């Protein structure tokens, strides 16, 4: 494969350089807040901040691997890996720290903890499946691919900016929070607050965390959408095209 990094900007390296500080800020912010809340204020567990540090280390290691393995290639697959790692670090802050750490580690009765955990996992999984089906429909049932994959000099080129524009044109984005889900979540929030007050002596410190968890879930689902979209368009799809045509897909734009 021709190394187009000499003639064009190295999009993989540029994206890695932008992603590393973003990953560190998001994951270490979550780790620092976790330490203050769960290790210091509540004194319940050191695992929340350890998880944040672990996320920072794993994400940075993944970015460095992509840099070492794919620099100079402008491979869309590598670009997708970087975008997915950055998206996951954002999901960690709102989904893992904001929601799941609360229901896993904050003092609360089991009747509150387990529905929150199981419901959160189920909602994330369900939403990922909804987004996957929607994105696959856009790829398989619209002219999207013909618009964004261009052959230039025997190479397949995917323009990121054009791809985003065309995807928004053909894709019908599912509503992250349908009306019934909004009513359900914001309707049960007062119930959880009342239940915590009745059954827990730590309501004062937990109430703010509960509101953060409830308000953070829609943002977490947004990053689930972005992660699934990036994975399909920039990781799975390039590999599928490479298998079918025998050519890698390169990134431009």
Q: Model features per residue range: what roles?
A:
Residues 31-32, 36, 130, 134, ...:
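Hydrophobic membrane-targeting alpha-helices
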Residues 93-102, 157-166, 191-197:
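Hydrophobic alpha-helical transmembrane segments in multi-pass integral membrane proteins
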Residues 9-26, 81-88, 159-192:
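Loop-to-transmembrane boundary segments
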């Amino acid at each position: 494969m021709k190394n187009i990094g000499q003639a064009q900007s190295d999009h993989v390296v540029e994206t890695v350089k932008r992603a590393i500080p973003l990953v560190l800020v998001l994951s270490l912010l979550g780790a620092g807040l976790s330490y203050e809340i769960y290790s210091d204020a509540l004194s319940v567990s050191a695992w929340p901040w350890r998880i944040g540090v672990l996320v920072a280390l794993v994400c940075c290691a993944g970015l460095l691997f992509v840099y070492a393995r794919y620099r100079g290639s402008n491979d869309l697959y590598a670009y997708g890996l970087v975008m997915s790692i950055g998206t996951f670090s954002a999901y960690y802050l709102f989904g893992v720290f904001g929601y799941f750490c609360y229901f896993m580690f904050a003092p609360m009765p089991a009747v509150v903890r387990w529905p929150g955990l199981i419901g959160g996992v189920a909602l994330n999984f369900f939403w990922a499946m909804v987004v996957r089906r929607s994105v696959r429909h856009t790829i398989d049932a619209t002219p999207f691919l013909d618009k964004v994959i261009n052959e230039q000099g025997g190479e397949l080129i995917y323009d990121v900016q054009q791809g985003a524009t065309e995807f928004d044109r053909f894709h019908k984005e599912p509503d992250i929070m349908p009306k019934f889900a909004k009513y359900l979540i914001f309707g049960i929030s007062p119930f959880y607050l009342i239940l915590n007050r009745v059954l827990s002596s730590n309501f004062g410190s937990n109430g703010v965390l509960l509101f953060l968890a409830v308000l953070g879930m829609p943002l977490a689902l947004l990053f689930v959408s972005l992660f699934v979209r990036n994975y399909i368009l920039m990781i799975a799809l390039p590999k599928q095209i490479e298998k079918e045509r025998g050519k890698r897909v390169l990134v431009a734009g």
